[in-house]
Amino acid sequence: MLKNIACFGVAGNFTGHLEQAGEAESFSSVKTSEETEPKAIFPTFIPSDSKNVPDFLKIFPFSSEKIIYPENETKLQIEPECAVLFNAEWKDGKLKNLFPLSFGASNDCSIRKDGAKKISEKKNWGKETKGLSSNMILLDDFSENSKLYDYRIASFLLRDSNVFEYGENSFVKNYNYIWKKLTLWLIEKFNSQKDEGPKENIHEYLKEASFPEKILVSIGATRYTEFGERNFLKKNDEAVVVLYPDSKYCEEEIIQKVKQRDFSDSEISFLVQKICEKKS
């Protein structure tokens, strides 16, 4: 199903993440209406054969089980996020509205790559290079009244039988832009974002994808813990991202579930990915 859906991410929707990721300088020339506004939308997958879409963006990158380690790169990090799947309403070639369908844990896995001109160049390096949970939770409202209001994002690195907290445990409601404010911002950027600096012309990509009925958006990465900021992924690690209801579980209970590999509760969106070498 996802292979027919245009997929995007949001840069700079948690204060401090871009600085930790070493990307703040790339966005230094990007003008925003207020300090907390995200910097840009970036593409991760465009379902199109058009020559106007870069070839790497035509490759479906999502997996719920593994991440293929990039060749000739060593600085690879988990980007723990909440992903939201929307129905898209179009009129006369413009996006008019977005209606939520489901949400889940996402790993917008990224290479810390010097010299990349566009954000997307650090995001998709082939098949099985990004993460999306197989347990997407139904969502009929994207507001303070929705079930998502109660959810938190947690992330972990599993290495040598140890569990390390990778991203700061954060409420979804604490994104800089969320609910209606984020929805309106997304619609504006999908229609009008220009090809400038690290940004790309998103509307042109959507046009080449024949104005898709559904759009997946990973709405921003949390800040890293001190461990997450300093430690890159290695082969045979496992990357874990969890979206869980705060009213039902505390952080320690989630850590225990990860340690015990108890991923059974359908109210929790778990994403567990093994870091693997590319098969020759």
Question: Residue locations for each model-derived region?
Answer:
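Hydrophobic beta-strand signal
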Residues: 218, 239-240
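Short, structured beta-strand/loop micro-motifs enriched in basic residues and often containing a Trp
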Residues: 199, 213-225
